[in-house]
Amino acid sequence: MSLFKRTKKTILIPPPHLLSGDEDRVTVLNAEGEIKISGKRPTTLDEKIYYSMSLAAAILGGNLHPSFQSLTYLFQQEMEFGSTIEKVNFGSRKPAPLTPIRWQKPEKCSFRPQPLDKKIPPQIYTVSVEGATITFSGRFLFSASHVGCDDNRVKLAGLDGFITSPNYQRVKDYYAQETVLALSFEIPTKKGK
């Protein structure tokens, strides 16, 4: 018997800090939106990482959130590849169109990964760092594993009629459910004499 893990099943939900009780299991898989940097542009890798960390902390309400590292990496990747037209494969269980990323203006970077539902409204987050203001406007794609039971998943996916839209089925079909080998250990109980 072969054991393997496939990519997690994903759905579209609001940013994780707007949820309660499940923050410890959140994983950001992808995002769709635009990063705008006004003022001092990041030129070195250190500056790009610092800007990305500041933006991720502003979105997640601090740097202790479980999604902080993955979101920082996502933003830093966009700032790194944004200076020229690049094609980046954001990762998929089947061949997916590569994502073009470009600077529309010297201070603006856009990125559009895998299909995201247009009915989920984009949100805007702004943070000020030394000599610059960074703004992200867009949507997030998270792992469904942190949403909990199916009831919660349906409730969250049902925002703006998403559960009844063709996009919901498309997203469900597009991403595979993660297969996990679960080992359960029972606490030994004392048998009666």
Curated annotation (Swiss-Prot):
Subcellular location: Virion membrane; Host endomembrane system
Alphabetical list of InterPro entries matching this protein: Rhabdo_matrix
Predominant location: virion
Entry function: Plays a major role in assembly and budding of virion. Completely covers the ribonucleoprotein coil and keep it in condensed bullet-shaped form. Inhibits viral transcription and stimulates replication.
Misc: Most abundant protein in the virion.
Subunit structure as annotated in this protein's UniProt entry: Homomultimer. Interacts with nucleoprotein and with the cytoplasmic domain of glycoprotein.
Entry protein name: Matrix protein
Origin species: Hirame rhabdovirus (strain Korea/CA 9703/1997) (HIRRV)
Lineage start: Viruses, Riboviria, Orthornavirae, Negarnaviricota, Haploviricotina
Gene name, Swiss-Prot/TrEMBL: M
